[in-house]
Amino acid sequence: MPHDAEAHYCGLPDIYRGEDVPLSNIHHITWDDIDGKTPFRENKELQKQLLKLMKKYPYMAHNAAFEDSWFKIHLDGYAEARRAGKIIVIDSRQICRSLDADVRSLPRESAPAALENWARRRGTLAADANEQHLGLDDTDLMLRTVQAEFNLKNLFAK
């Protein structure tokens, strides 16, 4: 069970100054949130801490190919550790596609395997609520949704 969760804001390279924060309309992160923060690529201590955790515990992400490719580019030592089998990635979207029969019957354009839609079907996200697109909030939603799916399918040991 996850514990002692942390969230870190990292800065952006100066090339983005004077522009909108990329994807701020999705993540709701503003320049005020990241002003004075070290960019992730330059924050070697945070990278070291994250890589250590990733080698110790598997990590789960919804559409994990995105995180996996991002970390390969931006996290020193990740690609080598991943290739050596020291980092295990679990994709909750693949869990959804494999276990949730609704995915096969709903129209593809309705994005049935999207975390928000899957969570609504499993009752872990209210019909009038939205996925936050913020690390800890979405991680909590993802884990509760996976647990709900596993409970529905009686996949937990008794």
Listing of model-derived features with the role each one plays in the protein:
Residues F66-D68, C96, F150:
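Glycine-rich nucleotide phosphate-binding loop and flanking beta-alpha elements
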Residues M1-L75, E109-G123, H133:
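Conserved non-catalytic scaffold segment of RNase H-like nuclease domains
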Residues I90-S110:
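Short alpha-helix plus adjacent loop in nuclease-associated cores
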Residues D128-D137:
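A short glycine-threonine-serine/GTX helix/turn-capping micro-motif
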Residues E67-I90:
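Substrate-recognition/cap helix-loop segment adjacent to the acidic, metal-dependent catalytic center
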Residues R104, A119-R121, L136-K158:
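Acidic two-metal-ion nuclease catalytic site recognized across multiple nuclease folds
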